[in-house]
Regions:
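Conserved PLP-enzyme active-site core in the AAT-like
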Residues: 1-218, 222-236, 244-247, 251
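Short, conserved phosphate/pyrophosphate- and ester-handling motifs at nucleotide-, phospho-/glycolipid
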Residues: 240
Length: 251
């Protein structure tokens, strides 16, 4: 909502924000938002909540459980809303030791979701899965109308077929999660507090100014106010993580 150049609102839709807890919203919040709209005497003056947008994992590295997704799905069904899941980091969510969701679950419980490629080792692109029948029919037309059509080709499909069928998509993401847990443990052992409890490839820690300066001499990390983000990826090596862990121990 803050880095997308108003792309959603540029299509004539309005974003209704809900407060999050560690990057997540709940079925109860969504139900309250929808109910508030339908309880209005004159709802025609207000924005109709029509689609719920979630990220898996969230921007904070946290995960929705299958139970939470099912509850949100049920609310969406009750109020006639679509459920969309942003899967830019899908591989890292599926590979987490705390995850209990599968791609099959997303296919059954959402209307639209996508399997992230660019952040998970693909050359380019994302794989969009549409399960809602009423959205499938005109989707290519929507793409054309909004200038979102790639030149015709077969390479994007080939790379996803190769990565998914071989299992490399899942294995590479899981490796990144395992390495992130090593970084997490190193910070925990050092007594460094975390801004949020994450079991995926993104770790958000709260460093002192001195600790930041020491690590910044060798490493690049995103400084988000009081919080610093350390990420692993499909390309991260064990040697790189071992070096970082050693330097964390020296803080």
């Amino acid at each position: 909502n803050c880095h997308e150049a108003a792309s959603i609102e540029n299509t004539g839709h309005k974003i209704l924000e809900l407060p999050n807890t560690d990057g997540k919203i709940t079925a109860q919040q969504i139900a309250a938002c929808a109910k508030a709209y339908y309880d209005q005497d004159e709802p025609e003056y207000l924005t109709e909540p029509k689609m719920v947008y979630l990220s898996f994992p969230t921007e904070k590295g946290t995960l929705y459980s299958k139970k939470e997704i099912k509850e949100i799905h049920d609310v969406c069904t009750k109020y006639g809303m679509y459920l969309f899941v942003d899967g830019a980091r899908m591989g890292y969510g599926l590979g987490s030791e705390k995850n209990d969701l599968t791609l099959k679950d997303f296919a059954e419980l959402t209307d639209v979701f996508y399997i992230g490629g660019t952040k998970c080792g693909a050359l380019f692109g994302e794989a969009l899965i549409i399960t809602a029948q009423d959205l499938k029919y005109r989707f290519k037309a929507y793409m054309k109308q909004n200038g979102a059509v790639l030149a015709k080709g077969w390479l994007m499909g080939l790379q996803f077929a190769t990565m998914l069928e071989s299992g490399e998509y899942f294995e590479a993401a899981k490796r990144a999660d395992v390495l992130a847990m090593q970084i997490k443990k190193a910070f925990e052992d050092k007594g460094v507090p975390f801004a949020v409890e994450s079991f995926t490839n993104q770790q958000f820690v709260i460093l002192t100014e001195q600790q930041k300066q020491e690590l910044a001499q060798k490493y690049y990390f995103e400084d988000e106010g009081d919080t610093q983000r350390f990420c692993t990826s499909w390309a991260t090596t064990e040697d790189e993580v071992d070096m970082l862990v050693t330097d964390i121990e020296k803080l």
